[in-house]
Amino acid sequence: MHTDALPLLKADEYPGGLWYYEPHTYQPYRYVLGRVGRHPLVCIGINPSTAQPGALDPTLKSVERLANANDFDSWIMFNVYPQRATDPNDMDRVPDRALCDENLRWLQAVLAQTEPTMWAAWGTLIEKRDYLPGLMREMVALTREKNIPWVTFGKRSKKGHPHHPLYLRKDSTPEPFDVENYLDSCF
């Protein structure tokens, strides 16, 4: 993957104000969706659903609520795999490497152009496809290079997976999350 030509994280006007949204039109994949700010809570889920600027799904409404309640100036939704699927069982059986590489380029852009806190929020969905933990490791490596902190909200699953945003209490607060230890112990 080339790092010398990172894309520019650009804010554009959409319903409700300024948003980060890549690609800029609805596609069968999405790399970035979020509100503009310098210190975002970057939520890492498994795959995007139908949300877009001004039309958030219930998961992203929860992400926005928790970012605001915990004093982050913004939030960005990112996913381990960028294919849109309202049902994670519909995700590709074999990952599209071009989509994965472009996803990593956009993550690098977010890391280079903001001062984020990463939120592990994929729940048990990381077990849906065998390739997801490997893709997660690639993302974690990028955050390790920049010493980016990781957090999670709520109780972890029996297997240790971080809680999905959809079912979190309104008063949830972030807790430090050792994402590398998690990956080593769970996969």
Where are these regions (language model features)?
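Short acidic (Asp/Glu) patches
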Residues: 27, 56-64, 97-106
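A short mixed-secondary-structure module that forms the rim of ligand-binding clefts
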Residues: 49-71
